[in-house]
Amino acid sequence: MENIAPALLDWFYANRRILPFREDPTPYHVWLSEIMLQQTRVSAALPYYERFLAALPDIPALAGCEEEKLHKLWEGLGYYSRVRNLQKAAKIVCAQYGGQLPADYNALLALPGIGEYTAGAIASISFGLPVPAVDGNVLRVFARLYNDPRLVTDPQVKREFTARVMEHQPPAKAGDYNQALMELGALVCLPNGAPLCEQCPLGTLCRARAAGTALSLPQKTPPKARRITPVTVALVLNEGRVLLQQRPAKGLLAGLWQPVLWEDTTLTAAETAARLAALELDCTGAHFTPLPAAKHIFTHIEWHQSGYFLTVPEQPTPAGCVWAGKEQLEAAYTLPGAFKVYKKLLLTKLL
């Protein structure tokens, strides 16, 4: 196949989105943006990116940030393991590389939370190294470009696609080339049966377009069914404060704060009262008002939430819990997006 780089780069320079991490592509900026964009759209991530950098402008600041502040800066993005790995890597970078990311692909790859794609993006965009950065967008572009019906999730197929990517990469413009492929996949060679083939700079070279198969590519393994998990939530209030409990240090939503809840069960009001009593919480005379049903989807789990709102008298704080007022809920304690329906309700109830 004819080399795609000239047409691709011409298109990219004329059509690329103006993004802050492109205008100032320092290694830290590119790293942070790529971690944020792993599970988040660009438009949604930009406010978080700017807020995060304003609070933590460099890697040493990230390494030294308190965990609760770090979680608060990430609140709303979800997948909190991303930001925990970000800080773990920052601490290693400070200890081993003087607070600056190393200009070496393999050294980047060894850091927590940095996989082949992210290492390639940092190495090529920030350091100009001629290495690949192959994400889902790039796999989709090449599956269609070569009209390749194989599963792009197969490791061997991905290696072959990566080799094809490198065949076309101009070493002196590796970063721009990698970004151009990502941008083409994000703006033109769209997923879910909606490619804008008439706008594609590679349209005359695209074998899937010529064969009429672009809509069926790339082939992917069907996703596994998510496990449905019932969850009972108790919004326990006292004097303008809500009772929060901290999740375990490992596992789903590790270390984050949540309303009092019980997983894998749907409880009646009486059963909820008994569970609260087991936490040594006095609910005598409390009225249990049903909460609206809510649903939250994780990667492999789907929470179906229900529960109750109640007000209790002043009393000792149960072990592993805190009482949080509205100001603390907004500024200090990170409530994951799984509880956004109930957080919105709480903010109307708290003084």
Which positions does each model-derived feature cover?
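Intrinsically disordered, low-complexity, charged terminal extensions of DNA damage-control enzymes
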Residues: 1-18, 23, 186-351
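Catalytic cores of DNA base-excision repair glycosylases
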Residues: 5-7, 11-198, 202-211, 215, ...
